[in-house]
């Protein structure tokens, strides 16, 4: 029997993958489904006739054409390959299996499209994954109900940035990548550009925090200096306006240092009725340096962890917080949630 060219067997295998996997979740018309089933049957017959030439990865175990799609876009084989790629590339044993719902202190989570390192012509290049940033580990699952991760990597030593060259469709501005020298590059696509930038911001902040290189305030945050410092800077210029043409014109009053909407000083510190070690919703971190102007104001630096005891003065824009045993009021605009629950 004449041998079948390798290019032909590869084409047939890719076509089989396209019909059984890629079109599996598509909403096809009745006529299109009949055509698809007919092609699958013909491919099966051809591969049976040339069993020696075809190395059938599925061992002729074809799924039923109308089988319900229980996957998120990729076949079971491709999902296993996704995990195998991790081991083969990094050369280290993976972390112990952990269920998505068992993760604690998650900084950021949600669905992303993850780009596969290797994919066939008809295979899915992007796979929907539920991702979670937990301490220094980036986990990805098939869904938020999975009992075991499909893969994970430690973000220490990596850098993260937006990348609009990964796709050419409407989501080209929604992509970002996490990379490091001599390590695998992980590429993701979010549902929107805003969501992608939030992921980049959280990952970048955590990488710098773990490396102890959170930058000091830059020029773009100059407007966050305390009002007292700003006032001192303009005091020398006030002399220019002291000479007025008429004596009966009143001198302009200087702006007050304290905020107009500042609440009254808090009474006896409120004691938390919950366990602080597990009350993740009330843990925040400083976005910028904040120097308190009054004794009842809490001073903190960017990246400092603050536990919020009370939001009694939320309408004024202030909360009652505690940091290192010191209690005081803090402006809520200067804070960012430490954990995403």
UniProtKB/Swiss-Prot annotation:
GO CC, any one term: plasma membrane
Ranges of biased composition (kind: Acidic residues): 61-70
Domain SH3: start-end pairs: 279-340
Coiled-coil annotated residue ranges, if any: none
Compartmental location: Cytoplasm
Annotated stretches, region: Disordered: 54-95, 246-265
SUPFAM superfamilies hit by this protein: PH domain-like, SH3-domain
Pfam family, one: PH
Keyword check for Transcription: no
Location, primary (coarse class): cytoplasm
Alphabetical keyword list: B-cell activation, Cytoplasm, Phosphoprotein, SH3 domain
Protein family per UniProt: Belongs to the SKAP family.
Name of the protein in question: Src kinase-associated phosphoprotein 2
Organism annotation: Danio rerio (Zebrafish)
